[in-house]
Amino acid sequence: MKIAFLGDSITFGYGLERKEDGYASLICRQMGVEEANFGITGTLMARAGMNREDGRSFLDRLYLLKDAGFAVIFGGTNDYFWSDRPIGNKDSGEDHFAGAVDAICRNIVDMLGTGKVLLVTPYRHNGIGNFYGGRHFEESNRHDTDQKNFHGHCLEEYVDILVQVAGDYNIPVLNLHEQQGFDWKIHTLDGCHPNEEGHKWLAGQIGQSITARAD
């Protein structure tokens, strides 16, 4: 079986000395299956911000999952930090987070069905983004994810959209935002990106959810 992972820098393994220490590789080695890692640093789920026209949004890359035996979609962090659009609703269009998540869920169900997909939400952390409306990675833009971003949304609002919309399509969700045991002071390199211990924690959480659902 091949497990495909669609994600951002966390799925890519940003900051790790060895990419094989990333959560996706840890899961696939443990399960003895093939890994297809489609993590790209800085990418949003919506066609917004830096991904408006570059073809790298989750929406634009969703087709990469078509041959997967099981697919994990893990995103939303960059939509919170870097989108140039407010959340919107499912009718707002695919350049707004809610509209993009609705399109992703609708299309992945058509592609794979509900039994071969897991949606994973962001975890609580401390990162650099557009808290002050900036577009650059500056330390002055650092903040906890319980604070509102430039558009007036905290990370939990993005998580709620993921949970609600996935539920509308009967897609299972692993809500890391509500999981206990992750501490960004211990499990990240920089407040956001997981270190080796952080990836081990992710592999445990996500791997358990996959095992419970995969054939």
Protein language model features and the residues they cover:
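Short hydrophobic segments within beta-strands
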Residues: L6-G7, V120
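Conserved SGNH/GDSL esterase-like catalytic core that processes O-acyl groups on lipids
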Residues: K2-A4, F12-G99
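Catalytic His-Asp segment of secreted/periplasmic serine-dependent ester chemistry enzymes
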Residues: S83, P122-D215
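A short helix->loop->beta-strand "cap" motif at the edges of active sites that frequently abuts
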Residues: L112-K116
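A cross-domain feature marking catalytic cores of carbohydrate-active enzymes
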Residues: G75, T121-P122
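Ser/Thr-glycine-rich phosphate-binding loops at phosphate-binding pockets of nucleotides
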Residues: D8-T11, N195
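Generic structural signal for well-ordered alpha-helices
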Residues: V101-C105, V159
